[in-house]
């Protein structure tokens, strides 16, 4: 014990050899043996691989570490040393450690292997990058993961995918196809099933060029995320129940979904793209298609997100192409809106149902709707206190209370209370509610149903009706191709033009205390005031034109050249005329 022993090639304990005897003790003779423990984790290409070696704490001197085709000499401190190497090739690397020994310890050697990953993810390398569904520790922030080929989850192999740090997810081969075989649980959304998830830790991530099939896409409390040129295809599978197949939710901000294809078919009636309690998010230039039993195609939602009360504000839904199912379904909106100060612009919706409307039970405000085109009969309802302009709507355009709308075209326009509508046209009805202001609008018919409305410079090809509830209506400077019926009281009707080839009245007034003056009215042979059929004596009907038919007769006798000629002009009218006439003879004018 404790001797220094050398014998030829033997040393330390190995140099003590007993030919006979029992119970001999041989230990701690110098130089002693020491194991080399190598500690190295898998590394990311271009990043440092940290290699730690541990010998007996009393070992001194140096050790040689061979890795990546190079040899590095390190000094031992308390029997330990650490080497950081960053220029290692991708794949499996071998690290070998040689210790030359010192006076106390003999030489020894050991080796092990570790991997350097380059971010190429296949169904064979997937579990190198995702440990228990989340990114491995050695995948650094900002890494690029290049997904290649198909990833099918099934009973034997389950590809859980949670992005919990900021990375870039791409497919250079263009064939990344991820099917997590999602089956949603409750319709209330608390069990969305297997998901592709970007959580708060994954904020700052970018995903592009990936196809997700029958897979819940779940962006949860994440920020500054971009989903670009992805496909989310759900076919005949219960995906998105209560949350939407592509769900951006729970306080997420600055998330962008753009240039992507979202297709949903028969998923049990759930929505496609759903933004729930999010702000400053953008859904732009996507193609969104729904077929069969599907829910809303794009939806700003507030349901099924416990623990978050952030309102859906300052989001942008722009330049998307949306096609709804045929036939239309009551549970499917093209775009459903809940929240404030959102921009809905440049979208094209082909659908026979509700194209752009407030979400069920929602009271959104202060949103902007512009440059949207709705075809196929789709309707559009503008939220209260909002702005709508340059929209083309093949169905009914409803302007919410307190809103401002201009330069819109629709099949029919419904103007809610206290809103302002101008410079627009409808091929069918224009309906106006209380306190609304309407100017420079064309339509096939007019119906006013609320009090205190102001309507001017409208052009109506057919009839107009001021209903019994529409008191104190002001109608001025407008044109009608059919009769105007005034059923309510205390209205002002001035400077309008109604010319009817047939009939007994241009205006039928059944309410009282109306002022009907200075209009141009013709109904068959009824002119001016005579073209007003007032059934109530309290109406004021006067100064309506024309006053009557004017017949002018001109006679003159032949005379010799150079002599004066006498020309007789006779004017017949149903009323007394006070204005002057002009007589023109051989291009010379005479005032009579």
Name each model-derived stretch.
Residues 14-17, 158-160, 193-197, 216-218, ...:
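Structural detector of coil-to-beta-strand junctions
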Residues 119-154:
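Acidic Gly/Asp/Thr-rich repetitive segments characteristic of extracellular carbohydrate-active
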